[in-house]
Amino acid sequence: MSHGPSPRLAESPQLSKSSLLTILGSPSPERMGPADSLPPTPPSGTPSPGPPPSLPLTAPALLADGDWESREELRLRELEEARARALQMEKTMRWWSDCTANWREKWSKVRAERNRAREEVRQLRQRLDTLTKELAGARRERQEAQGECEARGRELARLRGVHSAADKTHDGPEPEREQEPVRDIGAERPPGSQELDLVESLLKSRPEEPEGCWDACSVAAGGPRVSSGRQDRNRLPWEDTASTEEDASKLTALRLRLDESQKVLLKEREDKLALSKNIEKLEGELSQWKIKYEELSKTKQEMLKQLSILKETHQDELGRMSEDLEDELGARSSMDRKMAELRGEMERLQAENAAEWGRRERLETEKLGLERENKKLRAQVGDLEEALARRRRQNASALDCDLRASQAALFEKNKELADLKHVHGKLKKQFQEKVAELAHANRRVEQHETEVKKLRLRVEELKKELAQAEDELDEAHNQARKLQRSLDEQTEQSENLQVQLEHLQSRLRRQQQNAPLFGKIRSTRFGTEEAGDGASDLDEDEDLQIQVA
């Protein structure tokens, strides 16, 4: 509404100037005279053109000054509002750039975590491959050790069969009864210990019956040489001593070989036990690693799904944000263009204002000159009263013409004012539309802020889930360590029990070895009366062996 009177006030000096020119522009003093003589003739009803023009000159000037000041204040206020909007747009753009930078940092962190997880999975796969290779090698070594043990067992069984055949041919039925429990125990003992017991029994029985031992050795060597060996011993006693020494040396060599084979078998048994334990341990670790690998693969798939979903949502958000930024940039460019137009219009209005002020000063100078001329004309009023009376009709017609001209000019000015009001209404509508667009943009910005907050909350939830998964993985590692420690303790306990069992077996073996000697000594000393006691001792030994077994 403040823009409405501005065109009329801007053009009011021109109207006063045209009216003054129409009234005072005539060079003949006869036309100017009747205008000054109008005040003393009120019955005529015509307006006086003399002093009244001073009032329409001063009042429109004051109105124009106030209107221009209000318009300038309004334009300055609009300019400040436009600057504030531009600053707000810059702040929003800066905020969006910070948001995008934060999202890039977060995505880089997530990408680094994903690469780290991939590297851990790759390392676990490599370790699994190495463990499978080691397990395969351990299995091959175990099979080779089993084959070697079977070969050594067959060889020892063959030697045991040879010595048992020699004992059967030499000792007869009584030694068979004495060595019968030894054979029963030998079925439960390793072949090396059985062979060692056979050799010791041969050595112990040799001082009592050297000829029988010689016969057994000769029978083991070959049948045709037995008769010839006996004839030679009967013929040559010194050859008997030489053969016994040679036989003793052979027995010692055989005993050494048996000791070495027993040591080798014990060592191989220990290696076999260690390999079996290592294989079981590796199989347990392999199963654990397989379970962990499956869990990691599942977690990896879940994380990949979540990452793909987040990536899609982020791409959608980036697309929407880019579209919004393009819209904001377009609105900002339009606002800049509008600001430039407003600035140009303001400069133009300032130039027009300066021109109007110059025109006003010129009109004031002209007003002062006209006042002086009016004073001169008032002096000539008395002289021109008669001429004015004669030309009153002519002046009345001239005044009617001037009135019509002024009315036509006023109609044109009113028409221009209506056009300016229409233009002002259009500009006001455009301004309201821009304000509505700005409000819509602000609502869009608030929606984006809420979406960004939701995404931040989702990222925090994902971080918490990742921390929970890491805690569960640590708990699984701790449980695996606890199980490993318990397994180590059980293996130590089993080794201790194995050592105790070996001690008990060795004691039982010594008791069994000493039992026949004690029986012989007691039979020679006390006779046949205490034979029942020896049998009871043997029964007690057998019961002890059964309990240990």
UniProtKB/Swiss-Prot annotation:
**Coiled-coil ranges per UniProt:** 69-160, 263-398, 426-517
Protein name (database record): Coiled-coil domain-containing protein 102A
Q: Is Zinc-finger tagged as a keyword?
A: no
The protein's matches in Gene3D superfamilies, at most eight in alphabetical order, are given as: 6.10.250.2420
Is-annotated flag, keyword Phosphoprotein?
yes
Modified residue annotations for Phosphoserine = S12, S26, S28, S536
Keywords, A to Z? Coiled coil, Phosphoprotein
Organism of this sequence: Mus musculus (Mouse)
Instruction: Recall the taxonomic lineage recorded for the source organism.
Output: Eukaryota, Metazoa, Chordata, Craniata, Vertebrata
What domain of life does the UniProt record list for this protein's source? Eukaryota
Q: Where are the compositionally biased (Basic and acidic residues) regions?
A: 135-158, 165-187
